[in-house]
Regions:
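N-terminal, polar/Ser/Thr-rich
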Residues: 1-36, 116-125, 137, 141, ...
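Surface-exposed beta-strand/loop patches in extracellular or lumenal glycoproteins
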Residues: 40-63, 136-139, 145-154, 425, ...
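A surface-exposed beta-strand-loop module
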Residues: 46-118, 139, 174, 521-538
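Beta-strand-rich binding/interaction modules
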Residues: 64-71, 438-441, 451-542, 636-639, ...
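Extended, low-hydrophobicity, Ser/Thr/Pro/Gly-biased non-transmembrane segments
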Residues: 101-204, 571-574, 581
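Short acidic/polar inter-strand loop motif in beta-rich domains
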Residues: 104-111, 476-477, 546-552
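Hydrophobic alpha-helical and helix-loop surface patches within well-folded domains
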Residues: 182, 211-460, 468-469
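Long, ordered, helix-rich scaffold segments
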Residues: 356, 383, 532-885
């Protein structure tokens, strides 16, 4: 903790390490009230750094140094320099061995970085800079070493002892203790180190690789969760096969392990051979996990497995290059999920998330490029920009080069850089070299922050049969970047005739048309694209598949959007047309509300939804997505000044009117789908998930009628279903309804039945935290006293406080500022307990400039109170100070 201003680290100051560590030998002695770490490091002067022997400066925090030896000679206090951040030693020769022993306290480590206790087990989290809390080391990603790790602990409490690589030896020490040694043959940076010790059960399977090697697959969990891992195991085997088929990447160790941990700051961690997962990303079975949770497990298992190549075999030179591994791997996992499920639905989900959350980040005080220029605390840059926008940047390269060209580029990247720590530029260079293209201008996506705008206009010349698209790009100022150079923006499009068919696309100067769908490269501030031989006035279908992470504007009328919603051959753009239509209609309602007029819903939206409900051929998951109105958070993001109350009232009014007007078709679809759900055993497969998603959105609309038959249907679904997806939706409908007696009974029944399952209780907290009914803050404050809640568990904090501040906008933003005060209070407490979680919880307050003057003053006041609250962690200080700048 610190009160002085923390140091800013800049990309431009990067220098390679003075020394390299060839071998790392660690021995851990784990006890209940402390642990001892013995390290033996074989170091040498880095030849890239020239001659001479500068001091060796090792990172280390919260370590008690007990012994230090250089080349076998004990060092006294006068022989080294020690402060809170590092240990300095003067080497006497270019190659040397340093041995140290430190005492650490995992049992009291609430920050969950380094080595810590989660419940009864020991585990680690070293990315980004947690290893320095374990032992003195060069804790930076460009120092890669071969690790051998021995773990010693009490045998009865900790029968399972795990680390990276392959197990090579184990034995008993007597006095009730035992040990195990693990050896990882691959060089890795310290952030990929892992250790687990606990009383764990294991589900084991195997996988035969494309070169016919058998790999043992093991998932370790606490005994009560042994029946919740089959889905994760199936997902792992699918992702191993997919990575071989799509990228030619084969697994390289004899064993692959996953461990589920309840107390974890992130989703999961790709440590070499020993992935450590937040239990929420690995445990799933029908009765306890929703469809969304099953899909999250599948996606996260794949993401961490894919890191074995895109992250571990080829890693980052420095943390500014984080998107090198994360953007690429998010792209890989989203493509995997698209192949396993519905590609269009996956794209819709990803884009809705990106536009609501990452676009807001890009428009706020924490805006930064995909490759940031500077940071105070690296854990603040595990962001939507680095991950999700970074993935979109990789996707654009894929779009521009095509699948075959992209694969050539990724093959060259892995071949050229295996075993190295490299940069985003190295990734792009491999793509360029493999395809003979120049991506110099494209690289602005890595260095410029903010969301580009694309303004498009169309003009048809009937006599000449020419259609001209004028495209203008711009990008608003962001912190530290007042003006931007033009990006390379892949604009995928089609032109539709009056029947909704694609017209052949031939640009001026081309001899022949190139099909009905193509990608234009927008590279200038203003460009014209002239299509020839266009027989009639076309309607453009623009930015198909969301081919670039930009804000697009085109002057569509509502009738044109209705036409695209029904006829566009691009599934994503059908959804997008519906979203834009809904936005126009909702913004009209918001204006009426602000002027105190009676609210009138455009009947065209209802008719569009009626047509959707009648379309039995359309994928039910797409029907469900298209029936979902834009969220309050998205409506906030696209507002100049967000009127929280008008947005909430208008959206609720629209939902109410849709539910009333379409009661019959919604009721028909609901009953038909619920009957199949009743008669069919649960499967987490695309068609079943689609059926339940339409069934559940229908129920949520129907519930707004307040009719007794809907209450009965809701209770039947709640009590009579065999899966959490249906049960949780029914519970949420009751919680948001006026049926007080039934609501109270259902909540009590749920909590009583699932009280011993922490992940299910997280869902119970979230359903209540997200309810927009009056009194939301008081409900959340009461729930914080519930025995299942603790501030020390990040999942609980996210489920209750995070859900309230991020999803329950009408209650969080109540005019008296009590919601802001509550959030600031929690951030101040968490700053001392777990700085990473505290800084993430802060995000809603950082968006204070979005709101009316009264709310701005209240939100700003809470940020200032946090800043003045005493010893702030660098995590919280950076976010608060940038938000107030």
């Amino acid at each position: 903790m610190r009160t002085e201003q923390p140091k800013v680290i800049h990309l431009k100051d990067y220098q390679a390490a003075d020394y390299l560590i060839d071998e790392t030998h660690l021995k851990f002695e784990l006890f209940e009230d402390h642990s001892l770490v013995h390290a033996e490091l074989k170091l040498r002067r880095n030849p890239e750094r020239g001659a001479g022997l500068p001091p060796l400066l090792l990172h280390g925090q919260q370590l008690e140094l007990l012994a230090l030896e250089l080349d076998g000679q004990a060092l006294g206090a006068d022989d080294y320099q020690l402060d809170d951040e590092q240990l300095g030693v003067q080497p006497r020769q270019a190659e040397f061995v340093l041995r140290s022993t430190v005492r650490i306290h995992p049992e009291s480590n609430t920050a969950l970085e380094g080595l810590y206790k989660s419940g009864k087990m020991f585990c680690t989290q070293c990315e980004a800079e947690g290893f320095r809390k374990i032992t003195y080391y060069l804790d930076r990603p460009d120092v890669m070493s071969r690790f051998t790790t021995t773990v010693s602990a009490e045998q009865q409490r900790y029968p399972v002892l795990l680390s990276n690589g392959n197990p090579v030896a184990s034995g008993s020490e007597g006095n009730g203790r035992h040990w195990a040694t693990w050896e990882d043959p691959f060089k890795k940076p310290a952030y990929l180190f892992a250790l687990v010790a606990g009383d764990l059960w294991c589900v084991e399977d195997s996988f035969r690789t494309m070169s016919q090697r058998d790999v043992a697959l093991r998932i370790y969990v606490e005994p009560e969760n042994i029946d919740k891992v089959q889905h994760a195991m199936d997902s792992l085997k699918k992702s191993m096969r997919w990575d071989e088929e799509v990228y030619g990447r084969e697994y390289d160790l004899d064993i692959f392990m996953i461990v589920a941990v309840n107390d974890f700051n992130m989703g999961a961690m790709e440590n070499k051979g020993l992935n450590i997962f937040n239990s929420s990303c690995v445990l799933a079975r029908a009765e306890t996990a929703t469809d969304a949770a099953h899909q999250r497990v599948e996606g996260v298992v794949a993401h961490e497995y894919f890191h074995n190549w895109s992250g571990n075999r080829v890693t980052c030179r420095d943390w500014f290059q984080l998107s090198l591994k994360e953007g690429f791997t998010v792209f890989r996992d989203s493509e995997f999920s698209a192949d396993m499920n519905s590609r269009t639905v996956k794209r819709v989900e990803d884009v809705a998330f990106l536009r609501t959350n990452q676009f807001a980040e890009d428009a706020g005080p924490m805006a930064h490029p995909v490759r940031p220029d500077s940071f105070i605390e690296i854990s603040n840059f595990y962001t939507l920009t680095v991950y999700e926008k970074g993935s979109e940047v990789v996707r654009m390269i894929h779009t521009l080069l095509g699948a075959e060209g992209f694969r050539k580029g990724s093959d060259l990247y892995f071949q050229r850089h295996d075993g190295q720590a490299v940069t985003c530029d190295d990734f792009v260079k491999a793509m360029e070299d493999a395809n003979g293209v120049d991506l110099t201008q494209f690289k602005r996506w890595y260095s410029q922050s903010g969301t580009p705008r694309l303004a498009v206009e169309g003009e048809y010349d009937a006599a000449a049969r020419r259609y001209t698209l004028t495209v203008r790009q711009s990008c608003p100022p962001t912190p530290g970047q007042p003006s931007k150079e033009p990006f390379v923006i892949p604009l995928e499009l089609g032109l539709l005739d009056g029947q909704g068919h694609e017209l052949p696309l031939r640009l001026e100067g081309e001899a022949v048309a190139q099909g009905g769908n193509r990608v234009l490269a927008v590279t200038e501030a203003e460009q014209r694209f002239v299509f020839v031989e266009v027989p009639e006035q076309p309607l453009p279908s623009l930015l198909r598949g969301f081919s670039a992470p930009v804000k697009l504007s085109f002057p569509y009328s509502r009738d044109q959007l209705l036409f695209l919603m029904q006829h566009d051959s691009d599934g994503f753009n059908r959804w997008e047309a519906g979203q834009q239509l809904s936005v126009q209609v909702l913004q009209e309602l918001i204006g009426q509300h602000q002027r105190g007029e009676q609210l009138v819903l455009d009947p065209r939206l209802i008719e569009a939804y009626r047509t959707l409900l009648a379309d039995e051929a359309l994928d039910q998951a797409m029907v469900a997505e298209m029936l979902s109105l834009p969220s309050e958070a998205y409506l906030t993001e696209i507002s100049e000044v967000a009127d929280v109350d008008a947005i909430h009232a208008s959206r609720e009014f629209a939902r109410q009117r849709i539910g009333e007007a379409l009661f019959e078709p919604l009721w028909q679809r609901y009953q038909a789908n619920r009957k199949i759900s009743r008669d069919t055993a649960y499967l987490a497969e695309a068609s079943h998930i689609a059926r339940r998603s339409l069934q559940n959105i229908a129920l949520s609309y129907l519930s707004l009628s307040g009719r007794e038959e809907i209450l009965a249907a809701c209770l039947e679904q709640y009590e009579g279903c065999d899966n959490m997806t249906e049960r949780l939706t029914a519970l949420a409908v009751l919680v948001n309804s006026g049926f007080e007696a039934e609501k109270g009974k259902a909540l009590a029944m749920f909590a009583d039945y699932f009280k011993d399952d922490p992940l299910v209780m997280d869902q119970w907290f979230s359903v209540q935290a997200g309810s927009p009914l009056p009194g939301g803050l008081e409900r959340v404050q009461a729930l914080m006293q519930h025995p299942a809640f603790t501030l020390k568990n990040p999942n609980k904090v996210r489920a209750l406080i995070g859900a309230f501040a991020n999803q329950n906008l009408v209650n969080f933003h109540r005019p008296d500022g009590a919601g802001y005060r509550f959030l600031a209070d929690q951030v101040i407490v968490l700053n001392a307990l777990n700085p990473q979680i505290a800084s993430r919880l802060l995000v809603p307050l950082t968006r204070w400039r979005k709101y009316d003057e009264a709310r701005q003053a209240l939100m700003r006041g809470e940020l200032e109170r946090i800043l003045a609250s005493g010893e702030l962690s660098s995590d919280v200080y950076e976010v608060v100070s940038k938000s107030l700048a």
